From Swiss-Prot:
Biological process terms in GO annotation: carbohydrate metabolic process; pentose-phosphate shunt
GO cellular-component term (any): cytosol
Annotated Pfam families: TAL_FSA (PF00923)
A Gene Ontology molecular function term of the record: transaldolase activity
Catalytic activity entry: D-sedoheptulose 7-phosphate + D-glyceraldehyde 3-phosphate = D-erythrose 4-phosphate + beta-D-fructose 6-phosphate
Subcellular location: Cytoplasm
Active site per the UniProt annotation: 132
EC number(s) on file: 2.2.1.2
Keywords: Cytoplasm, Pentose shunt, Schiff base, Transferase
Any coiled-coil regions, as ranges: none
Name this protein carries in UniProt: Transaldolase
Keyword Kinase applies: no
Length: 316
């Protein structure tokens, strides 16, 4: 019998949640996802030093203002890392918009267009890029605009059913509902561990997946943020799963049958009317876990973006 990673690939598109080229070469995923924390981690790897230098040189040709140079360097570094990753995968790279723009629709759209132009100028076409945005109301509205321009989006930091519904109604390409961070919250709240089949994060993604398939939404469901392989295996059959290298290694080392847990019902039920902003806020705020985790996720990504900028500033 083949290992669990090989079996999972037959049921689900496996994506690598890393900015590290060596890990991507090893596990040969279809796609790869990055975020500000992963870019910061990758930027500290010696082999990426030339990419940082090239990004700084680019920024110096764009502006004499140091603050602008820092911004341009960070953007180009994310794109340069993305370009390197794209050499090793057949699919798409997800590159994230600055988390500090999470409540700024116009700013998010402008930053997304800028990142896509950087990729396009390097010969990378839109069908190989996903722009990551936080699943705030403003992020979802930004994605709605970008999708109409042919820029596909990956809506991340998704913790509530309201966020998932709003993303589908906006016609976004893909969502990344988080699993492990949901479980973390309930574990801290209830002071206990959860078996995979009762894991609140697993149950959340399962509910979203089934809802999308029941109503025939085309938005791709990509489970993210896993704490153990039990969570991953409970979501076998999900459209895509983005998995960190350490868990890919565990799956590769594990033997035993992988059972399909999520099955596309191929439904065509009449869809409910799209949520208004007020309805979205009301529904999202009924879920204290989602409120806390969305805010925390945005803050943490912003902190790592700041650390990256400080690192770049020291090199300018």
């Amino acid at each position: 019998m083949s290992n669990k990673l090989e079996q999972l690939r037959k049921l689900t598109t496996v994506v690598a949640d890393t900015g590290e080229i060596d890990a991507i070469k090893k596990y040969q995923p279809e796609d790869a996802t990055t975020n500000p924390s992963l870019i910061l981690k990758a930027a500290q790897i010696a082999e990426y030093a030339p990419l940082i230098d090239a990004s700084i040189e680019y920024a110096k040709t764009q502006s004499d203002d140091k603050a602008q140079q820092i911004q341009d360097t960070c953007d180009m570094l994310a794109v340069n890392i993305g370009k390197e990753i794209l050499k090793t995968i057949p699919g798409r790279i997800s590159t994230e918009v600055d988390a500090r723009l999470s409540y700024d629709m116009e700013g998010s759209v402008a930053k997304a267009r800028q990142l896509v132009k950087m990729y396009n100028d390097a010969g990378i076409t839109n069908d190989r890029i996903l722009i990551k945005l936080a699943s705030t109301w403003e992020g979802i509205r930004a994605a709605e605009i970008l999708e109409k321009e042919g820029i596909n989006c990956n809506l991340t930091l998704l913790f509530s059913f309201a966020q998932a519904r709003a993303c589908a109604e906006a016609g976004v390409f893909l969502i990344s509902p988080f699993v492990g961070r949901i479980m973390d919250w309930y574990k801290a709240k209830e002071g206990r561990d959860f078996e995979a089949q009762e894991d609140p994060g697993v149950l959340s993604v399962t509910k979203i997946y089934n809802y999308y398939k029941e109503y025939g939404y085309k938005t791709v469901v990509m489970g993210a943020s896993f704490r153990n392989i039990g969570e991953i295996l409970e979501l076998a059959g999900c459209d895509r799963l983005t998995i960190a290298p350490a868990l890919l290694a565990e799956l590769e080392a594990a033997e035993g049958e992988v059972v399909e847990k999520l099955v596309d019902s191929k439904g065509a039920a009449e869809r409910p009317a799209a949520m208004t902003h007020a309805e979205f806020l009301w529904e999202h705020n009924q879920d204290p876990m989602a409120v806390e985790k969305l805010a925390e996720g945005i803050r943490n990504f912003a902190v790592d973006q700041g650390k990256l900028e400080a690192m770049i500033a020291a090199k300018l």
